[in-house]
């Protein structure tokens, strides 16, 4: 094992080719021999960069409609051989196996295919076999091989090539190996969860968390694991804190109960609604929601189920609040609300529907199904002598939606 290694060869097999062109161009400039397969090889050739087909190395064609391309001893021998092991090097010479110093892979998009609602047949075909094997082999042998395991590493890898002219240090290879095992474990977790279908096992996997300003208190570190941008578009304001996110989650889950109703506005503090109203227009809904508890509303999180207009924005602007959430904001409403530089303004793109709630407990975790039931008139059983009026029933159902999301004694 050498600390510094000058790369002379690379194997490239990727699904996402965005950002690949400057990488292969740079490797060619540095004299690195490129091996590749199928569509990736065709893409590299289209950049005017010479590439050797893996089939030429293995003397074996791609078979089973492309299911088996790179799974061959001449490929994995070139990756897994220990450069400092004489027996390994003798075997490579015996079987004419070249060293592979860099392995660059981007896996089939299994997670995205599941999310798209594709058929089971299509999902199964997106379980990457060769790519994941290449990643594990290259990362295992990080002392001699650099593994680039996803498109998210392309920029860092290109910068490394440019900075060190194709040379890699042990610290570089170990860092990329850590990323590779993160990618492989994340990938396998989503495959397991697809097959398990929630039958008792708990396996969670998220990519690198987003560091927050702090946790619940300033002396605590905090991070968010998930795709915030999938749910929100942030227009304005300071970075969200741990407590902000808890309130935002509570606000979104509460408003999901009213997302298809008439204009509704809610104000939350410490994860609980301190005011909520449904009216003919959003401006009046805000006024009445605030009137429920104007004291607790100070520093709260505000959410609407429809576009916030100028009239509503002018009212909100007189209140100190941390976050304002809505499906959309009128342009002049945004201009008004942006007058407070720290106020966080979020477009709600969609209502997330997490199926489970998870929290740490003792030396393990508590897991439960999220409460997805909303009370309806047909579910009610009247047991009193006096029957409720239609208005009373509507009021009770309205209150029930709010009580469902209240974490303290409901009034």
Residue ranges and their predicted role:
Residues 13, 80, 103-108, 148-149, ...:
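Short beta-strand segments
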Residues 102-125, 129-168, 221, 226-231, ...:
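A short, charged helix-loop
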Residues 1-30, 39-70, 102, 178, ...:
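Non-catalytic interface/targeting segments
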Residues 18-23, 27-74, 78-82, 87-98, ...:
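Feature captures the catalytic cores and cofactor-binding loops of soluble hydro-lyases/lyases
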Residues 13, 34-37, 128, 147-150, ...:
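Active-site-adjacent beta-strand anchor residues
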């Amino acid at each position: 094992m050498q600390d510094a290694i000058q790369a002379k060869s690379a194997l490239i097999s990727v699904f996402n080719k965005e950002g690949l062109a400057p990488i292969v161009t740079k490797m060619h400039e540095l004299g690195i021999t490129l091996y590749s397969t199928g569509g990736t090889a065709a893409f590299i050739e289209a950049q005017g960069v010479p590439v050797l087909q893996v089939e030429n190395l293995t003397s074996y064609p791609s078979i089973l409609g492309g299911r088996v391309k790179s799974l061959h001893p001449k490929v994995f021998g070139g990756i897994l051989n220990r450069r400092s092991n004489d027996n390994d090097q003798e075997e490579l010479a015996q079987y004419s196996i070249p060293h592979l110093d860099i392995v660059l892979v981007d896996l089939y998009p299994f997670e995205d295919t599941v999310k798209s609602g594709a058929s089971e047949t299509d999902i199964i075909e997106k379980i990457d076999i060769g790519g994941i094997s290449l990643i594990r082999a290259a990362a295992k042998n990080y002392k001699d091989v650099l593994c680039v395991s996803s498109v998210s590493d392309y920029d860092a890898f290109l910068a490394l090539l440019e900075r060190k002219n194709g040379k890699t240090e042990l610290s570089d290879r170990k860092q990329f190996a850590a990323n590779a095992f993160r990618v492989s474990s994340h990938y396998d977790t989503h495959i397991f969860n697809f097959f398990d279908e929630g039958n008792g096992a708990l396996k969670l996997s998220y990519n690198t968390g987003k560091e927050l300003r702090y946790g619940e208190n300033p002396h605590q570190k905090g991070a968010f694991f998930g795709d915030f941008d999938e749910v929100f578009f942030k227009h304005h304001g300071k970075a969200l804190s741990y407590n902000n996110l808890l309130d935002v989650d509570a606000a979104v889950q509460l408003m999901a109960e009213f997302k298809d109703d008439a204009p509704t506005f809610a104000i939350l503090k410490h994860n609980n609604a301190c005011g909520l109203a449904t009216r003919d227009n959003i401006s009046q809904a805000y006024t009445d929601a605030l009137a429920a508890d104007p004291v607790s509303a100070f520093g709260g999180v505000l959410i609407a189920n429809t576009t916030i207009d100028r009239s509503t924005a002018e009212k909100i602007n007189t209140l100190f609040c941390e976050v304002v959430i809505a499906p959309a904001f009128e342009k002049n409403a945004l201009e008004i609300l942006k007058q407070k530089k720290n106020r966080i303004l979020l477009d709600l793109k969609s209502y997330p529907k997490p199926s489970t709630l998870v929290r740490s407990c003792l030396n393990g975790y508590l897991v439960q199904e999220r409460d997805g039931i909303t009370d309806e008139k047909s579910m009610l059983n009247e047991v009193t002598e006096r029957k409720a009026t239609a208005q009373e029933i509507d009021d009770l159902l309205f209150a029930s939606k709010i009580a469902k999301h209240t974490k303290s004694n409901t009034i």
